[in-house]
């Protein structure tokens, strides 16, 4: 009869052998929050992936969508800018949208998609809205037709973000219409880097 030490050595030898039922392109799927994928043809990449090991988090789902349900009217229109606050969050998968500051905070380095749709009231004013990344404008949208009742400023973009980067909308000028939830701000992680 085999002793405990012999059984442990036999088990270790079996585990050290090749994975049963797997080919070199098919990853071994593990239960839980982490997946380790080994590449049988690693490169000489100096970034640390030369070993051919990739670790992916199982909680990579990141998405948010927020709406404004009330009008957003600055008290002074001349050269006054402000963050657009969204008072109702519809989706916040990953809890990376700070509803108090209406700011998205990137949980990891990756490519993110953002879009916004902002409606101006009929007041013969132009609105300008910018998507800001860490305080700098990335894209803007304008609505300024003087002869329409309501007009929308919309835009969308893919952005590479680092962990901790912040994205938010800034009203450069004008008034927003939000009484029927017309103004929206949404984003999601396309893929991590």
Swiss-Prot record:
Annotated C1q domain residues:
57-193
Biological processes, Gene Ontology terms: cerebellar granule cell differentiation; establishment of localization in cell; heterophilic cell-cell adhesion via plasma membrane cell adhesion molecules; maintenance of synapse structure; negative regulation of excitatory postsynaptic potential; negative regulation of inhibitory synapse assembly; positive regulation of long-term synaptic depression; positive regulation of synapse assembly
Function summary: Required for synapse integrity and synaptic plasticity. During cerebellar synapse formation, essential for the matching and maintenance of pre- and post-synaptic elements at parallel fiber-Purkinje cell synapses, the establishment of the proper pattern of climbing fiber-Purkinje cell innervation, and induction of long-term depression at parallel fiber-Purkinje cell synapses. Plays a role as a synaptic organizer that acts bidirectionally on both pre- and post-synaptic components.
The protein's name: Cerebellin-1
Signal peptide, first to last residue: 1-21
Identify the stretch(es) annotated as Essential for interaction with NRXN1 and linker of two C1q trimers into disulfide-linked hexamers.
34-38
List each coiled-coil range. Answer: none
Pfam annotation, one family: C1q
Q: Where is the region Essential for interaction with GRID2?
A: 122-147
Give the principal location in a single coarse category: secreted
Q: Which residues cross the membrane?
A: none
Where in or outside the cell it occurs: the entry states:
Secreted; Postsynaptic cell membrane
Describe the processing and modification events after translation: The proteolytic processing to yield cerebellin seems to occur either prior to the secretion by presynaptic neurons and subsequent oligomerization or in some other location after release of the mature protein.
Necessary for interaction with CBLN3, and homotrimerization as annotated region, ranges: 62-193
Q: Mind telling me which GO cellular component terms the entry cites?
A: extracellular region; glutamatergic synapse; parallel fiber to Purkinje cell synapse; postsynaptic membrane; synapse; synaptic cleft; trans-synaptic protein complex
Which keywords belong to this entry? Cell membrane, Disulfide bond, Glycoprotein, Membrane, Postsynaptic cell membrane, Secreted, Sialic acid, Signal, Synapse
Q: Which Gene3D superfamilies match?
A: 2.60.120.40
